[in-house]
A protein has these predicted regions:
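Acyl-thioester-processing domains in fatty-acid/polyketide/NRPS systems
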Residues: 1-288
Length: 288
């Protein structure tokens, strides 16, 4: 485990994920999959339920190596969480399932998500002003939300949370984000929908400037300064950091409409998990 020494103990806990109908709106190649942002809520829930002192608003070294599918008939998705507690009190949590080999004799562990939670309190609110979209740099290319969710990120209504127009430039992207609705939990670490929509922004940027349809597979650090809430509006900014090869690397900032920062993410990793089966439409590259 990176930056953690003196591991104290590892425990396994059964976890039941309630498969709310809105989760069926998040899918890949026709199969509903649990979004990374929802998985982070589950990881945080397991952590504080067993170690209440954990700072779940400081998340590090997250990875999402494989999708966790949700069948339409499922009401409860059963998984398990492995929690490793370090000597300093910090935690790492893994969500996994068991898969049997074709022989039906041997089972193996399939990891779906991993994150490390810090022990220390989150950093002080940074004095990071909300930049004007006109100052992104480079020629702007605007995409209506309707076109995004029709052709670029074709998810169902619950996960259509970019509002208005997305502005893209070689130096970044900015969009207004919606806090979402429905049964999603916004108490622990905030609503999952603004961050999910910010990742859609990164996906759109990758389609225009890198020519691939990339999904999030991890991040280096996420700091939650304030919790986003459902039914509220935010502004998301994506900054490309390293796009010379996969995974594409981005940083992200989420503000409210008054310019107050709510979240920052660094080292977001985006990869074409379809292995080229999904391709951007030609129009997204117009004018390049």
């Amino acid at each position: 485990m990176e930056n953690i020494s003196g591991v104290k103990k590892k425990e396994r806990y059964p976890v039941e994920i309630k498969a709310y109908p809105y989760l069926q709106d998040h899918y890949f190649e026709g199969q509903a999959i649990l979004p990374a942002v929802e998985t982070l809520i589950i990881l945080a829930t397991v952590a504080v339920a067993n170690f209440p002192q954990t700072n779940i608003c400081l998340q590090k070294q997250a990875r999402f190596p494989r999708f966790l599918s949700i069948d339409p008939q499922e009401q409860i998705k059963k998984v398990f969480a492995d929690i490793t507690e370090a000597a300093d009190g910090s935690l790492s949590v893994t969500i996994s399932t068991m898969a049997k080999a074709k022989t039906g004799i041997i089972s193996r562990t399939m990891e779906h998500a991993y994150v490390e939670f810090g022990l220390t309190q989150a950093k002080e609110y940074p004095a990071t002003p909300l930049p004007d979209f006109k100052h992104l740099g480079g020629k702007l290319f605007n995409v209506p939300a309707a076109a995004i969710y029709r052709e670029l990120v074709p998810f169902g209504k619950a996960y259509q949370n970019i509002i208005g127009e997305l502005s893209l430039s070689p130096e970044g992207a900015i969009a207004q984000l919606y806090g979402g609705e429905g049964e999603a939990n916004d108490d622990l670490i905030g609503s999952p929908f603004p961050l999910d929509a910010a990742l859609h922004v990164a996906c759109c940027w990758g389609q225009r400037y890198a020519g691939i349809v990339a999904f999030p597979v991890g991040f280096a650090e996420r700091i939650i300064y304030r919790k986003t809430k459902k039914e509220r509006k935010y502004v998301g900014i994506i900054i490309p950091v390293n796009i010379s090869r996969e995974p594409l690397m981005f940083d992200a900032l989420i503000y409210d409409l008054d310019g107050i920062i709510y979240e920052s993410l660094s080292g977001i990793q985006m990869r074409d998990v379809s292995q080229g089966r999904l391709r951007p439409p030609d129009w997204i590259k117009a004018g390049l």
